[in-house]
Amino acid sequence: MLHVVPLEWTVEEVVPYLERLAVWLRASVLVAFQLTATVALSVLSWWLMPPPVAELCERGRDDDPPPLSHLSLVVPVGCLFLLLRGPSIDRCPRKLPLLLAYCLPHALAFLTLLMCQPSPQAFVGAALLALAVDLSCLGASLLGCDPGASLRRLWLPSVLSLLCATALGLWLLRAAAPFFLGLHATTLLTVTLMLIHDLSLITCQSSFPESFQPSLRLYVENVALFIGMYHLLRLWLWSP
């Protein structure tokens, strides 16, 4: 089979591969930035939390979530409104504020879970919050059309991905520690690679897939990434 392999490459043949590599590198930077910013905001908020608030969280971990945790809904709802009414990412010349707006609600959701040591009800609420932000940021900016129509068209994939993420999270909460950690490492690696692939389509300005299965997979990846990052962050903060 070696005779079919080209031994000499022209510039025209190499350029498409270099462009593809550049797209993957750019997508990798975006993924790394979002992961780093989300975890950094969560950890910074946890360390800067006033002692009275920390004591309140300590008392509320074994019970229902403290009332303070519900304040984290304010900023994500505000970001959701701004992203629905504001410019999409591909039309905005300054993308850094929008990327930070994408990370901040996730960081607040992580912080809420860290504060509450969540009951199943709190976990469902946080998963729904992260999913709503993903829908607003990814759906509205990638589809490049009316955000309201985009969200209405994707309501079924979003509901199914929420159910899948909730079931996965509740199962992982009861998993054994060694299996738990190895599963999360594998999950994070797989999901990150899939997100890089999706972001490569985004950076190439390709059309968002209109079929049901790719859109469902995209949102399942995002919510699964949320779950995996939360558990890894919780293990790191409470490690002996």
Curated annotation (Swiss-Prot):
Subcellular location: Membrane
UniProt source species: Human cytomegalovirus (strain AD169)
Lineage: Viruses, Duplodnaviria, Heunggongvirae, Peploviricota, Herviviricetes
Name of the protein described by the UniProt record: Transmembrane protein HWLF4
Family assignment from sequence similarity: Belongs to the cytomegalovirus US12 family.
A cellular component term, taken from the record's GO annotations: membrane
Statement: the UniProt record of this protein carries the keyword Transmembrane: yes
Swiss-Prot/TrEMBL keywords: Late protein, Membrane, Transmembrane, Transmembrane helix
Ranges that cross the membrane: 29-49, 64-84, 96-116, 123-143, 154-174, 176-196, 218-238
Bilayer disposition of the protein: Multi-pass membrane protein
Coiled-coil stretches noted in the UniProt entry, renumbered to this chain: none
